[in-house]
Amino acid sequence: MQLAGKRALVMGLGVHGGGTGVARFLALQGADVTVTDLRGPDDLRASLDALAGLPIRFVLGEHRDDDFRRAEIVVRNPAVPPNSRYLQIARAAGATIEMEMTIFFRLCPGPILGVTGTKGKTTTTLLLGAMLREQFPDTVIAGNLRISALEQLPTITATTPVVLELSSFALEGLGEAGLSPKIACITTIAPDHLDRHGTMEAYILAKEQIWRHQRPGDAVALNADSPIIRAMAVVEQRPDDVVWFASAAHPALAHAGRAAFWQGDELVWRDHRGGRHVICTRDDVQLRGTHNLGNIAAATAAACSFGVAPDHIRRAVQTFPGVEHRLELVRELDGVRYVNDTAATAPEAAIAALRTFDDPIVLIAGGADKQLPFDDLAREIAGRVKAVVLVDGTATPKLQRALRLVDPSVDVCGPFDDFERAVIAARHIAAPGDIVLLSPGCASFGMFRNEFHRGEAFRRIVESFT
């Protein structure tokens, strides 16, 4: 892929550095780089500082049609929809449309393992990376983790495993380019990002791109617990390439080939000959929540498909501490535990968090709308939660209506347009033995830059309590 001397336009720098890695990479490859973003320099200060000193032209606060007409390569941020009118201008002028991930896939010399899913993909990606690093210490972990894959390229050889977290947005671009990883893994699928994809069918199709362009002999690890995933065409088209995983001995596994599943307290790997190998037990697991048993099985299925030895997998499970912003214990104060699960940006993820705890929960929920239903989350709240503190946002009225329909007696406080006041209100409601759980079930846009900004604010507020 020739980049030197090419007129390259990066569309969308991003407030948390989403485009800095590809902009830096293109500049260092000798491309004539322009970065364009609708946000102004004040909003993008951290990203601009990260690119200081590089020969990059910036067009901020607007997109200019002429920039798209003159570009030979346009690299779109995953947040930019593929049907953007600016991309249509670029295509009409003969430009190639890329994403950071498509460039990386074309240039990466090592084998790629990709993980996607509505929930569980970050934990599974990092755990899979830890499993591989036990056997292959040079393993690279990147993707949808605020870690630029392109910046890791100089360290990657033909034998370096690369583990990538792949969002549905990134997979759209990979699908257009006809690219899939050697080992693919789909953790779960439930409604999410329907504000972007429009329909559940379109969202599923985006997720399916992770396996649709694989080569013969590649593998795809699929969740037997999910009816949506079990119905995917790859199951009939390439049965020998499918590796199953499940949080229990699911009936769908009875006649399947390779599989990783929990049987009682043991995680079992069944190889292609039908041999049974105990990988670990529940006593080896540090992660909270039954949903994380599924994540461990998913990572195990992918790791075993790549040839990682059971002992290496066991060591990774025993030492894996979890992921920040996901069921993260911030502190315990006056007998109350404060748990940061800000990464739960969809109702399904918040439901999984609520099912993790047996103690009374004061839930902090609400936020920006992704066109998702809240009926199931409302039922879970009514059955499990001591009180819910609502944060203002475009989705919050939908959650309020769902709660009123399910159980008008649910103790609801708010909504608050000040996040600190919401956290303080939750503290006042909680009693010794309770859990204050930030698991919003919604996106964060409007009040915060992103969900991680929201989680950091929660940490800061809780750590300030005396």
Swiss-Prot record:
Where in or outside the cell it occurs: the entry states: Cytoplasm
What Pfam family is a match, any one? Answer: Mur_ligase_C
Annotated ATP binding lies at: 117-123
Q: What class of enzyme is it?
A: ligase
Q: Which reaction does it catalyse?
A: UDP-N-acetyl-alpha-D-muramoyl-L-alanine + D-glutamate + ATP = UDP-N-acetyl-alpha-D-muramoyl-L-alanyl-D-glutamate + ADP + phosphate + H(+)
Enzyme Commission code(s) on record: 6.3.2.9
Disulphide bridges = none
**SUPFAM superfamilies given in the database record:** MurCD N-terminal domain, MurD-like peptide ligases, catalytic domain, MurD-like peptide ligases, peptide-binding domain
Q: Name one GO cellular component term.
A: cytoplasm
Any Gene Ontology biological process = peptidoglycan biosynthetic process
Signal peptide interval? none
Q: In which pathway does it act?
A: Cell wall biogenesis; peptidoglycan biosynthesis
Q: What is its main location?
A: cytoplasm
Q: Which UniProt keywords apply?
A: ATP-binding, Cell cycle, Cell division, Cell shape, Cell wall biogenesis/degradation, Cytoplasm, Ligase, Nucleotide-binding, Peptidoglycan synthesis
* GO molecular function annotation: ATP binding; UDP-N-acetylmuramoylalanine-D-glutamate ligase activity
Q: What is the stated purpose of this protein?
A: Cell wall formation. Catalyzes the addition of glutamate to the nucleotide precursor UDP-N-acetylmuramoyl-L-alanine (UMA).
What family does this chain come from, according to its entry? Answer: Belongs to the MurCDEF family.
Question: Which protein is depicted?
Answer: UDP-N-acetylmuramoylalanine--D-glutamate ligase
Source species, please? Roseiflexus sp. (strain RS-1)
